[in-house]
Amino acid sequence: SGKAGRKQINFTSNTGFTTPVRLPDMVNSVEFANYFNAATFNALGTRQYSEEKIALLQQYINDPTSVSIFPEVSNNTYGSWENSANGVANTNWFDLHYKPYAMRQNYNVNLSGGNEGTQFFVSGGLYDEGGSLRYADINYNRYNFNVSVNSQLTDFIKVKSNVKYTQNENKTPLAGYEDMFFHNLARMRPNVSPYDFYGNWNEQSMIPYLQSGSEGKTNNGTLVLLGGLEISPLKNWKVFADLNFRRSNYDGSTLKLPGTIYGID
């Protein structure tokens, strides 16, 4: 709570950045093809990537403009795009989807003051953190509010009260499919391009779903009320009575919309 005397106002703000840690260190498409060939040859006696395909992958790494990234594709049909040995690219799927950093901001303001009989303290805060995914509008916000008042009503009666409220809001376009998104992200082959025949994001990139307008929202609120009474009927004899009340509420909503995948029927 505040102290007797003149009012004081304090304001603080902090801005920082978050960055992903311990992301997988992905191999390039040539290394992947050689590893995959070794695995399939040991298991089945066959190789999925021919020497010609591996040479094309190396050529793409050396000069991406010197080779077609769709040598097996002749049209933009839906079935042309799959997570297979088809395609010539060098896609790091984690680099594609993760930004190098995301911004976070924290603001707090408080007011305190009072007199010999009553002291008060009021504070409020806002915390905002953006998500690390490049093509997904993910945000986390937290709001908090606090009021505390202590009052000496008489020489032997003192009351105190405190109200705290916190609201947490989380928004994501993954709309309940977070596990599937990250599961698929780690399984995509680097020789597969995120683009279709005409330069649009293909389904394997998962970006059409992130930009479809789908949205999952959750809100968590907590209200805490604290009250206390202190009575001193006799010298060196104090009686305390405290009341605590806590209430939490949660609500969530999910909107799932189809992604726009370009192609021909």
Positions of PLM-derived features:
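Outer-membrane beta-barrel channels and translocator barrels
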Residues: R104, N115-E116, Q152-F156, S232-L234
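Surface-exposed loop/interface segments of Gram-negative outer-membrane beta-barrel transport/assembly proteins
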Residues: A4-A89, Y127, G131-V224, F240-D242, ...
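A beta-strand signature from Gram-negative outer-membrane beta-barrel systems
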Residues: S1-N10, R104-N106, Q119
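A generic beta-sheet turn/junction motif
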Residues: A4, G113-G117, L126
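Periplasmic N-terminal accessory/gating domains of Gram-negative outer-membrane beta-barrel systems
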Residues: S1, G16-F17, D95-H97, A102
